[in-house]
Amino acid sequence: FSSRRRHTRSFHVTGVQTCALPISLSELTHKRRLSALGPGGLSRDRAGFDVRDVHESHYGRICPVETPEGPNIGLIGALATYGRINDYGFIETPYRTVRKTATVSASTDPATLVGRMLTSDTRRRLPAPVQERASSTALASLTSVVAGEMVPVTQEIAAELVALARAEGEFELSVRPYVTGPEDPRFVGDVKYLPADEEEAFHIAQANTVLDDNGNLIESRVASRYDGEFQSAPVDRVDLLDVSPKQIVSVAAALIPFLEHDDANRALMGANMQRQAVPLLTPEAPYVATGVERQVARDSGQVVLSKASGEVLSSTATEIVVLGDDGESHRHTLRKFIRSNQGTCINQRPIVSRGDRVVEGQPLADSMSTEGGELALGQNVLCAFMFWEGGNFEDAILLSERLVQEDKFTSIHIEKYEVEARDTKLGPEEITRDIPNVGEEALRNLDDSGIIYVGAEVRAGDILVGKITPKGESPMTPEEKLLRAIFGEKASDVRDTSLRVPPGVQ
């Protein structure tokens, strides 16, 4: 990564790649990939350890876990879960604003003040006219509050504060640091996106900082970051709060249960290997999950979502029709048995029935790697860690035959094979069923044109398309000339270049 400032690194997008579509996760992670290679970037041959290592500016922006294991390690990264790109091309990460005062005005709803914690400094920091009036109200009890003690705002105190604001005008009430909740109208505005260089001036607490039911920070000291360093700071210094513990990692890493207990090297392998899963015949959502699975499935674009709220008019294997509340019919076409770029089978299955009530954005059909609108990469199987007469020596495992009989890990792949008939110096190639030195048994699945029938079952070595190519002729004996004149035998001047099933394919 090229250095912009001491605490920032830049990335850029180069070239066009074929999208990875085997499963929802691989498509999503491919679209969120970052690269430091290419024109204007680094070279993998000359990139040292320093530019590959995790940097403090990566926090909440580039995942420290998900990266390739080969020569591109550290040069190819992944966007963190909540990271986004600003107008100038730099990565930003969100933080929650920690409020240290509460605005009290004549129009303030007293209920919004209930639950805030008043401290020994609250009365001292009030404007002088408000302090004088407060001495004859419920706030007079604050004079006896000792340092470190907190008094919760009750309905009575909240009403007195609003009454003071009506008499003396709007004022700021010093309270225990707190963050707003999702039900607060200020919540969205309190979420700030910052690039790496701007966050250096703030004390930022971790997402696991202890909060009470009203969002107050109740500990006197909290673990925080300031100017790129981790430290323990008094709660009064905290300016921002992480939005989530998973904001430092990518989507793939956030799918690993109990990630905090994993060794970093094994977590890297797990995040990369999840993308390599192939879609199964019967996807099954995991029993042990992290809560990100449903959002990953939606954001991948492979799950069909309802265009409007309404009632399902029809639900078939190829189309779902929803009658919206606006009276219009909304058609949702499903993708059936389409080959992906990696040769896997793209297939969408309806999960709603006729007459069901749906809302806008609700999943209507699963993809090949989801179940019930939730990411499903594998199967829930019962595992035992035990000895079994040496059958599981070292890295060997024993499997129940039910896994095979019930097609638990069976997948469908669609391969595309092409053949071309070219004009050569010795003459044109020909697609034909008349192939020299090939028995009738090998031609049984070919039509008159030499092309395999649709639905034929083939194995490795079977002919898919018959093709012959001219070859240089050698002098023929009189017997060969006679046979060629009588039977039209071409064995002497053509060779078999038919397209056959590759080894290992059935």
PLM feature spans:
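Intrinsically disordered, low-complexity regulatory segments
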Residues: 4-5, 9, 16-506
